[in-house]
């Protein structure tokens, strides 16, 4: 059961969305329950590694970020000689189709995107040694119908994001420069973002924190009309990786705006994330899957 703090924050966030964005954002509180049952046709020839870009939204939709992220990830994969297939059809989460991919990217997905059978097949594929990348909105729902998603896949429960202003410059700080996703990043850089806050830091949930945001460099508040809520976390990771069974999961809370995917830092971050997610030898997840 969600805490009273999370419930209050959900209410504040939803009210702000409705006030600022109007009826088009009603799906935040009245999400769609659309589930596909007929899988899309995947090309017969997929060079390896193969990347699946999944961007279905049954809740809030990042209209600009989704195509921008898909474009960058496609370019990065093709530069490596990999194949890419993009879809918003949840029926692709079946054993036959998933077996054809090495990496699955959840690109700003939202809401409950899979039915019960698809969820089971996705968890089985991942824990058996698959590689996954989750971007921004994929970990940005205030509540889920599927506890496994925030608790095991993302390993953090989103509460609120900055508001007043919504988008701010903040200093991102690399904590682990040895990870493929961070090895080409500067130690610190200024990033313009809608900064997510979580119910608690994932640091003690068996994750490798790669990047945190320095909360002294921006205003971690939700301020709108009469509402003024402190959403500081103190310890505030924004990028991390972990093992889920024998599989690899990389999560980045960065990437609300399309412009973010044109910055050299995001190019380096997501390029390295692809390398890591596609190569089991770059993580120590195989042994954990056997435990």
PLM features per residue range, with description:
Residues 2-11:
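Bacterial N-terminal signal peptides that target proteins for export
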Residues 5, 53, 59-142:
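Helical hinge/lid and interdomain linker segments adjacent to catalytic or ligand-binding clefts
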Residues 21-22:
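C-terminal motif of bacterial Sec signal peptides marking the signal peptidase cleavage site
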Residues 25-46, 72-75, 79-82, 88, ...:
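Extracellular ligand-binding/catalytic regions of CAZymes and related secreted enzymes
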Residues 31, 35-36, 160-245:
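Catalytic beta-strand/loop cores that center a nucleophilic Ser/Cys/Thr
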Residues 49:
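Nucleotide donor/acceptor-binding cores
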Residues 58-59, 92, 111, 139-140, ...:
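Short, solvent-exposed loop/turn segments at secondary-structure junctions
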Residues 112-187:
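A glycine-rich, often tryptophan-bearing local segment used as a flexible ligand/cofactor-contacting loop or short
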